[in-house]
């Protein structure tokens, strides 16, 4: 099962935010953002922090590809 974060990157563009801004606002490590940039898996806790910071749902930032 693969994961796509294309929606997250588009949302960051729409909000005029950089990945570094996301790290600070969500309180997540740059390693987590790098992992997502490579299509890797991150913990649900990281995704929840991102959703809280961006005021969105997981469906707004992640696609699961079967």
What do the predicted segments below correspond to?
Residues 32, 46, 60:
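Residues in the helix-turn-helix
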